């Protein structure tokens, strides 16, 4: 099962629906769910959803602080991506302009979550803030003309972040990104 931490984003149910469409068991839980309850669920992966406020991400940071107790792949979407970057020492701030549109990203490293996908994708973005500077120990996976860190991966742990929303229908190959993540979790 993959646990989806609900950070109040407008697309959280689309994440769940995409995973279910792929045949993956998934469960949306409040981001305030205690760590012990999350551990008892024995998730094989965790997704941090998007949301409106980086200061209202509940126990997502605690999961990162206690990563060795979970030891499963983590994928941060939009706000979740920013939270991961901030937690590991990256810089998050306002973008040059708010993005509520399709953006073309360039995949620099096919890596795990982009395995088998084209080098350029049109993706849906819905954000004011963005990762301005990659955290130490992370590798840049994708960028765009408007955002320097569209996707990243921890160099030694299976922790990923994407600024865009793979779950939105406008994103090309969005379901494939979730399929690749589910495969990393051993769910497919």
UniProtKB/Swiss-Prot annotation:
Pinpoint the Glutamine amidotransferase type-1 domain residues: 1-188
Which cysteine pairs make disulfide bonds? none
EC number annotated for this UniProt entry: 6.3.5.2
KW Transmembrane (keyword) present: no
Which pathway does the database say it acts in? Purine metabolism; GMP biosynthesis; GMP from XMP (L-Gln route): step 1/1
Entry keyword set: ATP-binding, Glutamine amidotransferase, GMP biosynthesis, Ligase, Nucleotide-binding, Purine biosynthesis
Q: Name one Pfam family in it.
A: GATase
The molecular function GO annotations come to: ATP binding; GMP synthase (glutamine-hydrolyzing) activity
Q: What is the active site of this protein?
A: 78 (nucleophile), 165, 167
Which of the seven top EC classes does this enzyme belong to? Answer: ligase
State the superkingdom: Archaea
Checking CDD domains in the record gives: GATase1_GMP_Synthase
The record's catalysed reaction(s) read: XMP + L-glutamine + ATP + H2O = GMP + L-glutamate + AMP + diphosphate + 2 H(+)
Task: Return the Gene3D superfamilies for the record.
Answer: 3.40.50.880
Q: What does this protein do?
A: Catalyzes the synthesis of GMP from XMP.
Subunit field text:
Heterodimer composed of a glutamine amidotransferase subunit (A) and a GMP-binding subunit (B).
Name of protein: GMP synthase [glutamine-hydrolyzing] subunit A
Q: Which organism is it from?
A: Thermococcus kodakarensis (strain ATCC BAA-918 / JCM 12380 / KOD1)
């Amino acid at each position: 099962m993959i646990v989806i931490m609900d950070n109040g984003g407008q697309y959280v149910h689309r994440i769940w629906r995409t995973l279910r469409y792929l045949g993956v068991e998934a469960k949306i839980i409040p981001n305030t769910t205690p760590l012990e309850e999350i551990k008892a669920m024995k998730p094989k992966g965790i997704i941090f959803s998007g949301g409106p406020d980086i200061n209202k991400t509940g126990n997502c940071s605690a999961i990162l602080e206690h990563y060795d107790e979970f030891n499963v792949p983590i994928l941060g979407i939009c706000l979740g991506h920013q939270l991961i970057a901030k937690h590991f020492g990256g810089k998050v701030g306002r973008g040059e302009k708010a993005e509520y549109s399709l953006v073309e990203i360039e995949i620099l490293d096919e890596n795990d979550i982009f395995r088998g996908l084209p080098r350029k994708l049109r993706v849906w973005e819905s954000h004011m803030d963005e990762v301005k500077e990659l955290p130490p120990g992370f590798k840049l996976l994708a960028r765009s003309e408007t955002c320097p860190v569209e996707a990243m991966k921890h160099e030694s742990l299976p922790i990923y972040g994407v600024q865009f929303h793979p779950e939105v229908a406008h994103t090309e190959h969005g379901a494939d990104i979730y399929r690749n993540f589910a495969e990393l979790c051993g769910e497919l």
